């Protein structure tokens, strides 16, 4: 599988907490690009950093494993799990992260690619937005961040879901995600945005100021 622009954009744009002993999770790591970019950004700056990466596709896992093993940053090789994020969340309920990032599947109602690996990587029937949000909510620490990249249509859909869940949780003293940053990426200045880079924070929902 080739490196795609979405992964590089997210890996460069997302904010990493610059403190020792942080934990990060890459959901749907693919070839491991974003996890490796995260490792590079904190290498020689932080200590005790842990990076986990989850990937459901076996062939992609082989690529990621090779890339992780060749990473030049001692002690910062991501831990790879060949499973779905749904199963990972069920098997590892004690794991909590300061930062979760993902370049998830996004084609909802389109014909599948005959190439199975590309189909798994692109189609959301392997990971719906609802499942993604549920798993992220279970795995984030309070105050933790979730960074994600999606095409415009799917990005706007995710923002609507997050806003609905946030408003529904106000006054209930439960942690939910709320949007903190959104970057709309255009291929040229005059064109409509093609990608949404989004960052959410996991905290108790409170009334927003007008």
Locate the predicted segments by residue.
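Conserved SAM/SAH cofactor-binding pocket of Class I
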Residues: 12-93, 99-102, 108-113
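Domain-wide signal for the mature, well-folded portions of proteins, strongly enriched
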Residues: 30, 87, 122-126, 131-135, ...
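Conserved SAM-binding loop and adjacent beta-strand
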Residues: 1-16
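Mobile active-site "lid"/loop adjacent to the S-adenosyl-L-methionine
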Residues: 104-131, 138
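Conserved Class I SAM-dependent methyltransferase catalytic core
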Residues: 3, 126-193
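Short, conserved micro-motifs enriched in small and acidic residues
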Residues: 4-8, 29, 149
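Residue-level signal for inorganic ion chemistry
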Residues: 10, 103, 132, 200
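SAM/dcSAM-binding transferase cores
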Residues: 191-210
């Amino acid at each position: 599988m080739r490196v795609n622009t979405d992964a590089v954009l997210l890996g460069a744009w997302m904010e990493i907490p610059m403190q020792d002993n942080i934990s990060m999770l890459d959901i749907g790591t693919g070839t491991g690009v974003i996890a490796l970019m995260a490792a590079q950004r904190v290498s020689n700056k932080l200590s005790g950093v842990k990076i986990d990466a989850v990937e459901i596709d076996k062939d992609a896992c082989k690529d990621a494993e090779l890339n992780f093993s060749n990473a030049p940053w001692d002690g910062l090789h991501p831990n790879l799990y060949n499973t779905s994020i749904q199963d990972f969340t069920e098997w590892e309920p004690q794991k909590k992260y300061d930062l979760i990032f993902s370049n998830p599947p996004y084609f909802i109602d389109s014909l599948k690619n005959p190439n199975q690996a590309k189909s798994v990587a692109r189609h959301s029937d392997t990971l719906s937005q609802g499942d993604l949000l549920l798993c992220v909510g279970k795995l984030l620490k309070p105050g933790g961040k979730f960074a994600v990249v999606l095409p415009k249509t799917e990005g706007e859909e995710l923002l609507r879901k997050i806003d609905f869940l946030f408003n529904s949780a106000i006054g209930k003293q439960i942690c939910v995600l709320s949007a903190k940053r959104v970057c709309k990426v255009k291929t040229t200045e005059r064109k409509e945005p093609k990608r949404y880079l989004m960052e959410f924070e996991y905290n108790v929902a409170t009334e927003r100021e007008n």
